[in-house]
Each structure stands twice: as structure tokens, then as C-alpha cells.
Amino acid sequence: MRFYQELQLNQSGSKELIRQSKTTKEKLYHIAVYLFKIAITVAFCFLFVTLFSILFGSENSIAGVVVLLCIMVFRQAHFEIHAGQSTVLLALFFINMTVCSHLAHKLPPVAGLLVNIVALAILVFLGCHNPSMFNQSTLVLGYLLLYGYDVSGKSYLMRIAGMAVGAVLTCIVFYRNHKHRTYDKHVKHILQEFDLSSTRTKWQLCQIICVPVVICIAELCDMPRAMWAGIAAMSVILPLMDDMQYRVRKRIIGNIAGVICFTVLYFLLPSPIYAFIGVIGGIGVGFSTQYSWQAVFNTFGALAIATQLYGLKGAVSLRIIQNVFGVVFALLFCIIFHWFVSKIKVKEVL
């Protein structure tokens, strides 16, 4: 395997290559390549978001994160349909994330709930057809980040401009990398495959309904950072209930561990470099292949921002409460939803 090809591997691929090394020299080489890949990835991400913030305003740095996430994911991920139609869908998703997230945030919680359901239905039904691709971790996460860090006035106009540029860049990268792939399916085939008896459709509906409901309840309870609960719910909703229960446990444990680690760093490090704790978290995620460790390090970035607004005690309390509420509610919702759908199918048979 050539150097460039090895750089294209994900964390699991790189770690597997290291494990399969036959000599110490070979193992050290693969470790060096892996560390170099992490370093250039972190540097690229930092420079990209910094440049985006300079061009479109610091309040839109989160939009830069969303654009960066889409570019990095969709250079490899796809929608399993015709490349041309997929590219059009990708542009539609950017419009959806930019417009609907802003509209939903401006409305009262219940009205915003309806907008969020419609917006997520477009993203999930058309963009998350294959659960194993985990496209929801990009599209739904991106939507929720823009929703949670909404802006208005001139800043929103700059966000529109930034997301438009991001859409063009992502579509170019996506089409360039996928234009030679052949898929027999088109958009109409995806819509025709809607079936309440299928595991995939039930999973999609849980994502579409549960995540907005979680956010709505959090907002009605006047919880700041309601989108944290939505992100937590999104991340644990999986097609198979056993997998979902596993993720719920790991999310709660990982979040508490992340809060403890962040608190320790907060007291050990000097205040001028608190913001870099989020960078440490990003590096940690880069090294992580297991969901539990990703949950730990993802906590760093969220708390690095929240502590500036709510203080350490407030941010930590919010993080734990929102995440536990989000994942537990999602688990209960999915159990009830699956039971309800099974009852409907039984009545149809009778």
C-alpha cells in the first residue's frame, strides 16, 4: 500500500494495518503515517474553520464546521443512487439545513417541532437510506448544530453565503469522487421502498420524530442548549434495539467520563488555553474507533464553548442532564414506537 493510499484509510483501517504489521520497523512506519494523518487532518480542520470564520464572521464558525464535516464525509460516503441526482440532493440538503434550522429556531417550540420534523424527513428519507453509512451523523448533526447556534440579521445573510459556498465545494468534491460509480436506483426508488414493516423505515421514522420531540420538550422545560439532547438522541437511535441499548449505556458512561476529564483539565491548565481543550477533544476523536471513547472526547468541544456562557458548574450540569435525558427518552420512544407499529401490522393481518 502506497503512502497516499494509507492516508486515505479511516481510524479502523489504520489501526488494523498497525496490528497486522509483521516487523517492528513496519509497525513503526504505519504508526508514523497514522500520526501524520491525524496531525494534517487537525491542521486542515483548524485552518478551514478559521478561514471560514474570517470570511463569514466568527459567529458563523459553526457553519464552517458543518461544511467541513460534509466535505470530509461525502468525499467517500454516498446515497446509493445516481451520482447526478445525489449531487442535486446534496445541494437540497444544504438549503434545507440553512433555511429550516433558522425558521424552526425563530418559531415557538411546538411550531418549531413541526418544521424540524419536515426538515429531518427530507434529510433522513432521501439522504440516510442505508443505516450502515451513518449519513445521519453528518446531515442530522449538521442541521442540529445550525439550529442550536442560530444567528440573525446580517450574520444570517453571511451564513447563507457561507453555506452556499460550502454547498458548491461539497457538491464538486462529491461528484468528482462518485461520478464513475454506477447505481441503478433513483430518488423515486427510495421513496417507493417506504415500508412500515421494514427495520430501516422504522429507524428512519424514529430519527425523524423522536429527535425534534426531544428538542421541543427540552425547550418547553427552558433547558439551554436543547440541541444537545437532540444530538444525543440522534446518535443512539439505531435500527436494532440491542445495538441501541448498547449505545445508550456507552453514551451515558462516556459523557460522564468526558465531563470528569474536562473538569480535571480545566483546573490543571491555565485559563488562556481553555479554548484548546476542544482541540484536544478533536484529536482524541481522531484516535478513537469505539463509540464510547468518541462520546468522551466529543464532550470536550461542547463544554469548551458552554463554559464561556454558563461557567463550569452550569455547563457540566447541562451536559449531563441533556445527554441523559436525550438518550433515555430516545430509547423509551423507540421501544414504544416499535410496539405501536407491530400492533398496527397485527391488526392489518387480522
Say what each PLM segment does.
Residues S101-Q192, L196:
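Membrane-interface helix-loop-helix junctions at boundaries between adjacent transmembrane segments
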Residues V42-T50, I54, L89-H102, N116-F125, ...:
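Transmembrane alpha-helical segments of multi-pass membrane transport proteins and ion-pumping complexes
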Residues M1-L90:
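N-terminal signal-anchor module of multipass membrane proteins
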Residues L51-E59, G84, M97-A111, G153-G162, ...:
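Membrane-helix interface and helix-disruption motif detector
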Residues V42-F46, E59-A77, L113-S152, A167, ...:
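Pore- and pathway-forming membrane helices of multi-pass small-molecule/ion transporters and channels
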